[in-house]
Design a protein with these regions (language model features):
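Long, contiguous, secondary-structure-rich segments that constitute the structural scaffold
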Residues: 2-31, 36-37, 42-131
């Protein structure tokens, strides 16, 4: 069947479930959250060293030993994992008023790379209460 000219092809593709993709967020309080899949792809680490490139505006999370004091513990949270990265975020001047989702998190040579310029606001809307 030939399509008429008024049809437009949808090029967005299907939605990939959060179970099958990497999902990473940064909250306004400095909590880095990632799902089970991301934790598994990192090698299921118990702690991580955190790095920041001001030039590229990228956060790097490298699996590390929990025995080294400056490494951040990775703790379970609901169906994922969290890093309490407040000191890291404050030290590097990373500010956000919202929870941000990293659109294209990537793992290179075992290091998770999170581009601060490649984020979307995922903070739930606050609705005004009716009087």
């Amino acid at each position: 069947m030939a399509l008429e000219r008024d049809f437009e092809k949808f090029t967005g593709g299907p939605v990939v479930s959060t179970r099958d993709r990497m999902h990473v967020t940064l909250s306004h309080t400095g909590i880095i959250y990632f799902n089970q899949n991301t934790h598994r792809l990192l090698g299921n680490p118990a702690a991580a060293a955190l790095y920041y490139s001001r030039e590229r505006d990228v956060i790097a999370i490298e699996p590390a030993s929990p025995r080294i004091e400056q490494n951040f513990p990775i703790k379970p949270l609901q169906s994922g994992w969290r890093i309490l990265a407040g000191p890291f975020v404050g030290h590097n001047g990373i500010r956000t008023d919202h929870t941000l989702r990293f659109v294209h998190p990537d793992i290179e040579n075992g290091v998770l790379l999170l581009g601060m310029r490649d984020t979307v606001n995922v903070t739930p809307r606050r609705y005004k209460k009716k009087k």
